[in-house]
């Protein structure tokens, strides 16, 4: 449109110029022609075209004219030819030549001008294009420099500017196309390097996880130490008001608390490094920014989470020897804490890379694995100190992660499982302690030679006896050395159990209940078992058993002081809160019963040993007139033993004495009726009667006080009536009154009488070969045979009745 308008504007001008050329003298044509070249750059071409058109018009007119004047032209030509030789001389020819020469210079100058104008225009265009391209080249050079310096985020921003701002301006140039083709490759290189950098950064984070966790756990422990120190100081003030018999060990342990608190406060002053101080997160941030700028955050998030989950699995997999030392558990916990502290840091400093839902899912997965690992490896721990240190680590571990918002209730539930295991290890340890105490005890009353020694024992064991206090030195405590040691060790066990119950976020009531239950286990399972094993040991004699019974009595009385001791350290009132009672009463009562039974057994065994020394001449004609030596030794032994029994409770001594007499009576009866004994003379019966009389005298001498009347003598009533029957030979009375409640020989068994009578009958036959020639002997023999028949009838009747 613009060209057409321009053309319309130049037509009248060209016509004017043509008119001037046609109407102007030839010498003045130069300025007119110059005006043509001064106009538009291509105007001379159009002018030439116009000139040609004008020439053609004139040619046509000339042709018309020539056609009109053709004949005349022919004639003129003919005439001209005639004058051709002279035409060159004409001035027109010379003028035309000069005109042509002058026009050539103008044409040359015109062409030079056109060429200069084109060059000028090209230079201007080049300058403009260079000014447009230079920023692109500079930005691309800047991009290359940023890539070489690994400033990828800045390079990415530069790349965006190139694509959005600079490249559209020069998109028509080939170099721009080449640059644009390199951008995807640069992006790919950038992403690959970022991934490599991220992988290295994540590996560095993993390597520093233990230091991060150690710093976090240390910080959590320091924050907790101050409050714990204050609480312990308050407990110390309360402990100083406790009863002297209940808090001796407590006060000794409480004296350490202020120093410990000061140490904790000194540690609080130390600077704790943060996670930013320990780990360089720039690779993560850089990669996140780059992928965010690329619009591919999801790929980066998936890659990051995938890599961190792999690291989590590595962290959660402990070494096989983790259970051997506390350092193994500490490294395991610090790595886990470091891992989740990093995740929490990423959660709070980034948007969307890590979400709360993701961290909770990861924590739940990790928590299940941690619990499984701890449950498996802690089962190998047999050292209570190691289990306690493990518990402290778990508490610090849980408190640390709880401070970062992770739920840790399942860890404290696990601690209750470990607490049972800890109690089991404590019970095993204290079983060894109790065994050592019992092995080292001399089972004799504790001798006291001075007031200081008396106070030492009183400070270790709650013993109150006004009569003993009034006695002068030297004197003896009724219990042996093991009693205060056992009491102290039970309190030490309570302390050891309390150490595990601390920091479990449980109320004082729950802690009190746990202490009482664990103490009950110690008493009912361990101490009771140790006592029973001690009682059943072969080398434990009657004196030791008596002392054990006395010891258990005092330990049973001390149980109320143990209950008060637990109440004091937990600050729980038994009146306001229902508390578990200690089972010391039943524990020591069972041990006493076992010791009493063992006393009865060993006493009977000792009686059997003496009875086995008996050496009767069952065919003697007359007795020696004095009791057998073995029996007198036995009675003397029983007297000395029962003197030791004076320290026992009355019923125990009475039962032991009655049991011994009954066993002695039974043993003598069995000796008399032994089937291997075929013959017994009346002299042997008389000798045996003398021994039984000594037994009756011993029973009537009240070797143990507390028996009423002849209660103890009744133990020998069966022997006495049987021997009286044979000594008096009162068979008519026995047979006549048999079965009557008021019978004189009510305790004589027909079978026993028959057995003994048959032994005596055989002796009579053997010793009285000529008895058949004496009437009295024949009558006695007939009486024996008659009595034997009647006794056999009674025995048969008893069997049928049964």
UniProtKB/Swiss-Prot annotation:
It is found in: Cytoplasm; Cytoplasm, Perinuclear region; Cell projection, Growth cone; Midbody, Midbody ring. This is Exocyst complex component 6. It comes from Mus musculus. Pfam families: EXOC6_Sec15_N, Sec15_C. InterPro entries: EXOC6/Sec15 (IPR007225), EXOC6/Sec15_C (IPR046361), EXOC6/Sec15_C_dom1 (IPR042045), EXOC6_Sec15_N (IPR048359), EXOC6PINT-1/Sec15/Tip20_C_dom2 (IPR042044). The lineage of its organism: Eukaryota, Metazoa, Chordata, Craniata, Vertebrata. Component of the exocyst complex involved in the docking of exocytic vesicles with fusion sites on the plasma membrane. Together with RAB11A, RAB3IP, RAB8A, PARD3, PRKCI, ANXA2, CDC42 and DNMBP promotes transcytosis of PODXL to the apical membrane initiation sites (AMIS), apical surface formation and lumenogenesis. The gene is Exoc6. GO terms for cellular component: exocyst; Flemming body; growth cone; perinuclear region of cytoplasm; plasma membrane. GO terms for biological process: erythrocyte differentiation; intracellular protein transport; membrane fission; mitotic cytokinesis; vesicle docking involved in exocytosis; vesicle tethering involved in exocytosis. Its main location: cytoplasm. Keywords: Cell projection, Cytoplasm, Exocytosis, Protein transport, Transport. Belongs to the SEC15 family. The exocyst complex is composed of EXOC1, EXOC2, EXOC3, EXOC4, EXOC5, EXOC6, EXOC7 and EXOC8. Interacts with CNTRL. Interacts with RAB11A in a GTP-dependent manner.
